[in-house]
Amino acid sequence: MLKNPATKYRPFPAIALADRTWPNKTITRAPIWMSTDLRDGNQALFEPMNAERKMRMFKMLVQIGFKEIEAAFPAASQTDFDFVRELIEGGHIPDGVAIEVLTQAREDLIRRTMESLRGAKRAIIHVYNATAPVFRRTVFNTDREGVKRIAVQSAKLIREIAQTMPETQWTYQYSPEVFSGTELDFALEVCNAVTEVWEPTPEHKIIFNLPATVEMATPNIYADQIEWMHRNLARRDSIILSVHPHNDRGTAVAAAELAVMAGADRVEGCLFGNGERTGNVDIVTLALNLYSQGVDPELDFSHINDVARTCEDCTQLPVHPRHPYVGDLVFTAFSGSHQDAIKKGFAVQKPDAPWEMPYLPIDPADVGRTYDSIIRVNSQSGKGGIAYLLESGYGVAMPRRLQVEFSSTVQKLTDASGREATGADIWALFQQTYLRSDGAIGYVSHRLTERDDGSQHIRLVVNIDDHEHICEGSGNGPLDALVHALSHVLTAPVSIHHYEERALGQGANADAIAFAELAATGVAGSVFGVGVDANLTTASIRAVVGGVNRLIARTGQGMLRRSSAQATVA
């Protein structure tokens, strides 16, 4: 790179539009959408689509809701010409949908292109020629008058041919190619000259498409250009003002949105931003940006994964995993703080309330995505994401301190493996950590009775070193009685710091899950035990026994009183 890029590159000049109005505008309705996937998108592929893939793409575009679809560049190849004929003769174009075809401003190409449309009910004939100074000098070696003459002559020829094909409802479209690099006064001069030839009316409008064939400046500059044309075009009420942004600077979506605010009625683009070089503007992102603001985009992306897979199959181009709204990772949070915020957001979000969710601009369900992949766990994740995966996938709603405890266990797993931990991985680790049955003390059975004084008495059968033993104890409640019973086989007193219980899932037949936080005298910290059983009391006993086993493991079996465990204790 140059130390001083100013010696090679010049900044794009600002537009003199001191009273611009677009910054104060809001988009309140969708523009007219025109898909150029089958033309601009197709010509930019390593391997252009064959007829079968083009037809598959066309039918999907119709299903999504596009009313204008640029089908081909018929004069460019026999394949494109034949595809247009198949659309017409095969009856594939629904009522209310117009196909568009593109031609350069040359007589032979215009005649060939118009012939491809013979018999169509509705058609848009789109002619273009480059108007920018660099093209006038370098490519065509002509002046302004020469460029305008080409546009006017082409417009006249198109009108003459169209009048010989009255069975078709025609819409004429003209593009000053490289509009973004053309002097505004000259772009206006050429467009107004074409208007004089085509003589549009408010009932029969023409389209002027103003492309950022190459994106040359910031989106506000393009918006200024569009607003200037919007104000100054002759017969503006008889013109559909269209934009065709490319993404060379990475801001095509912003450019299109600001252009609509500046007066554009129509947007041309491709699904997922396919197209020459860095691509056309992405209509999916534009449409769903509108949707996220409560504006009906008039395109249906309810099954966005299906749209993405079809595009990938037809174009042989992958959709990036972080592509807005559709990428595999766009509704995914790995960060611990993000996961915690999303988990809390889902807890308070009501089905009929406005969507207010941390880190998720739209509800994934609206585009056919599930919540399964929203929270994924790697070495950067925190307790919130882990808790969400266990609760959403397995019904385990952990107490907060258990979330903290278990997250460190998961962290060790992801640090060691260096990979993402799936919900299944986390559930398996949870079972291995809290629900294993091979602890020092194995629960066998119990009998709980209430004494005359209101206290509870438990007769607990446990397995220690492959021998069954009976431990008995009394207390103010079942858990207090259980702790007293277990004290006979432990060298240190155990206390229950926290206890929670809830259903594991929904319905009358759901198992119970219990969580007990235990501490022992002389043992640093506390640990959790978890118990699952169809019977709530049994689940609570399993939780306490599980926690005791984890304390015993922490002390290297030092807490287990084996000498007393060789016989029945009471």
Curated annotation (Swiss-Prot):
Catalytic activity: 3-methyl-2-oxobutanoate + acetyl-CoA + H2O = (2S)-2-isopropylmalate + CoA + H(+)
Cellular component terms (Gene Ontology): cytoplasm
GO process annotations (BP): L-leucine biosynthetic process
InterPro entries documented for this protein: 2-isopropylmalate_synth_dimer (IPR013709), AIPM/Hcit_synth_CS (IPR002034), Aldolase_TIM (IPR013785), IPM_Synthase (IPR005668), LeuA-like_post-cat (IPR054692), LeuA_allosteric_dom_sf (IPR036230), LeuA_N_DRE-TIM (IPR039371), PYR_CT (IPR000891)
Record localization: Cytoplasm
Keyword terms, alphabetized: Amino-acid biosynthesis, Branched-chain amino acid biosynthesis, Cytoplasm, Leucine biosynthesis, Magnesium, Metal-binding, Transferase
Listed PROSITE patterns: AIPM_HOMOCIT_SYNTH_1, AIPM_HOMOCIT_SYNTH_2, PYR_CT
Positions that bind Mg(2+): 40, 244, 246, 280
Domain Pyruvate carboxyltransferase: 31-305
CDD domains (alphabetical): DRE_TIM_LeuA
Main localisation: cytoplasm
Named cofactor requirement(s): Mg(2+)
Sequence segments annotated as region (Regulatory domain): 437-570
One MF annotation (Gene Ontology) recorded for this entry: acetyl-CoA C-acetyltransferase activity
Pathway involvement of the protein, from the record: Amino-acid biosynthesis; L-leucine biosynthesis; L-leucine from 3-methyl-2-oxobutanoate: step 1/4
EC identifiers of the protein: 2.3.3.13
The family this protein is said to belong to: Belongs to the alpha-IPM synthase/homocitrate synthase family. LeuA type 2 subfamily.
Assembly, per entry: Homodimer.
Its job: Catalyzes the condensation of the acetyl group of acetyl-CoA with 3-methyl-2-oxobutanoate (2-ketoisovalerate) to form 3-carboxy-3-hydroxy-4-methylpentanoate (2-isopropylmalate).
Entry protein name: 2-isopropylmalate synthase
Species the sequence originates in: Ralstonia pickettii (strain 12J)
Lineage: Bacteria, Pseudomonadati, Pseudomonadota, Betaproteobacteria, Burkholderiales
